[in-house]
Amino acid sequence: MVTIRLARGGAKKRPFYNIVVTDSRNARDGRFIERVGFFNPLAKGQEETLRLDLDRVDHWVGNGASTTDRVAKLIKDARKAAA
């Protein structure tokens, strides 16, 4: 099953997440099909917190990909910011 989820990066105590499309059987930070954005929960000042390619997300969801709860909330926030 294809899923859209967060893959953790960054340093210890400084998380940075890539939003990736992957097979659900792959490791959290392992192989992925496509990177569709990123999420930086510790962004300060003018730094970008969230960037998401909504066209590609719509493409994958339209083709049957599921999203995790957190990614679904991030997609909702990105749509609200884009409007």
From Swiss-Prot:
One of its GO terms (biological process) is translation. One of its GO terms (cellular component) is cytoplasm. GO terms for molecular function: structural constituent of ribosome. The keyword Ribonucleoprotein applies. Keywords: Ribonucleoprotein, Ribosomal protein. Pfam families: Ribosomal_S16. Gene3D superfamilies: 3.30.1320.10. InterPro entries: Ribosomal_bS16, Ribosomal_bS16_CS, Ribosomal_bS16_dom_sf. It comes from the Bacteria. Belongs to the bacterial ribosomal protein bS16 family. This is Small ribosomal subunit protein bS16. It comes from Shewanella amazonensis (strain ATCC BAA-1098 / SB2B).
